[in-house]
Structures are given as structure tokens and as C-alpha cells.
Amino acid sequence: MLLYIVIIVACIISKLVPNEYWAIHLFFIIMIFMVYMYKKLDIHQKYQFWNYTMSGLSGHNVQVTCKCY
């Protein structure tokens, strides 16, 4: 459901916003979607999410240790 809302909002913004600012708005839409998905995860999945994200961004194997009590 949220994905459809994000797509609809992206289409509306693409029609209203000048072309040179489209990348900035797309970045914020993606960030909002990532935060929403992150909040749905439990504590162990959150650490795995950041391990995968940081590994993808840096190109190196990154391990965030989970101190879950």
C-alpha cells in the first residue's frame, strides 16, 4: 500500500517540480520509504538492515555488532 502511495506522490511531484529539482525530491521520497520500512523491523532485523546497507554503500564487508538484551 505504501509503495503505491510513494509512486503516486512521485508522479505528482514530477509534474509539479521543475526538472532540475527532481533528483532531490526523489532522494527524499526514497529516504522516507526506507525509514518507514526500518521502523517495521524488530531489533535483530534492524542490525542486519544496517549491515547490508553499509556494505552496499562502502563496497566492503561491514559488521555492526548487536548488543541486544
Curated annotation (Swiss-Prot):
Keyword list, A-Z: Glycoprotein, Host membrane, Membrane, Transmembrane, Transmembrane helix
Cytoplasmic face of the membrane: 1-15
Glycosites: 51
Parts of the chain that traverse the membrane: 16-36
Any one cellular-component term (Gene Ontology): membrane
Extracellular-side segments: 37-69
Superkingdom to which the source organism belongs: Viruses
Subcellular localization(s) per the UniProt record: Host membrane
Membrane topology according to the record: Single-pass membrane protein
Protein name in the entry: Uncharacterized membrane protein X69R
Similarity remark: Belongs to the asfivirus X69R family.
